[in-house]
Amino acid sequence: MLKILFFAAMSLFITSLNSGSNGNCYYIGNDTEAVLVDAGISCREIERRMKRLGLLMGKIKAVFVSHEHSDHIKGLPVLVKKYQFPVYITPMTMRSGRLNFEESLLKNFIAHEPVSIGGLSITAFPKFHDASDPYSFIVSDNNICIGVFTDIGAPCIHLKKYFQQCHAAFLEANYDEEMLEKGGYPIYLKNRIRGGKGHLSNNQALELFIIHKPDFMSHLLLSNLSKNNNSPELVKELFNAHAENVKIIVASRYEETEVFRISLNKSVKEIPVYHTVAKSSLQLSLAFT
């Protein structure tokens, strides 16, 4: 059944297209434009997953790159070449990732200085991670804020400040401390993961959530779970015990999540998306029940 929805004002729509060491890509948009944060899966998979969700590639106006690790950039060259998307990336990340784009498509950003993409405002801030110049992002529109907080070795003061502003967030919960300790990784890799410039553990993420989540937060998408040192069931149970009115979603390393509608009105609950089809001159969009 085909449905058309004229979006209500004052909403953002978010989904994780993939989240994990095999590739990361996050979509945040309003009813007219959207951005991707990272493109760590192939262009073809981005297209397929967005199509399944009823999201139009034509709404994407830019890609923001958090850092140069391959699970965040490996789909970027083909995606940008095909669609000519502007790429917001720092020079150090460009060099470290050995990336090369048309000069006209290259855009820089500066920490804590908002970038306007249509009605969207994107603010980057530095984070602790073992990359050359890594950043997290806040995407906002009409006072609705979405955070993309993954690949973080430890919560910094900026993360805590921005988390308190979020109506929804993609938050890393990479590993269970006991599973990592008892697992088969070599000691150097264990220390890299938990050493302050690697990844957030479930407990670190939970502490941030409990202490700093604002009353108006409606959705938390737990992201970048380790395949070997975590369990979706474990981390969801852990967070649900403290969620109160926040909807907890575990982002998958194998498929896209639903599209979630984030509103200033916390009582607005979206939800499963009816897949749609774009036909010639008629642009169809998401339909929510």
Annotate each predicted stretch with a short phrase.
Residues 37-40, 61-68, 88-91, 147-151, ...:
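Active-site neighborhood of phospho(di)ester-bond hydrolases with catalytic His/Asp-centered motifs
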